[in-house]
Amino acid sequence: ESLKNAIISSGENELTLKKEDIVVWDSNHNSQMSTVLMIDISHSMILYGEDRITPAKKVAMALVEYIKTKFPKDTIDILSFGDEARPISIKDLPYLKVGPYHTNTVAGLDLAFDILRRKKNNNKQIFMITDGKPSCMFTKDGFYKNSAGLDDFILDQCYNRARQAKKNNIP
């Protein structure tokens, strides 16, 4: 379409493409997407006086608004994760608070998978808003935590979840 406009405006012998000739198509996809948005509410989101939770909530609210207005047939679920993961409603998102929690990324991913498993459409994705490293998880022996550096045991479980997501075509 852009080349056709350029030919019409400049003539066949001398092709000059001007900005008025350019046509941009905004295609509308009919496929539906199920999205889970994970938000870290661990203590480090406000540690040392640095407020990371407010920008995280703003990004989350912008993403929700974008999906709800641009893709009204899509679904978006939100969960928070600290020591535990729990679903939160969109209306409660602005009031989300950081707690004296660690970062249980494994629990967050497990809950995200549970939510997506219940969705009927095939297109699924997970977004995670976090400031750092996973520092705890539940094991058969109880609550395991390690805030000092990267813990190989916790990281391995996170990587296992990432492989599971890839296997299930969840980016």
Sequence positions of predicted segments:
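Acidic, polar low-complexity linker/tail segments
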Residues: 1-36, 43-50, 72
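…and closely analogous acidic/polar surface helices at protein-protein or active-site interfaces
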Residues: 28-34, 43-78, 97-104, 116-117, ...
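Short beta-strand-loop
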Residues: 72-102, 114-119, 137-142
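Von Willebrand factor type A / integrin I
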Residues: 119-121, 133-136, 140-171
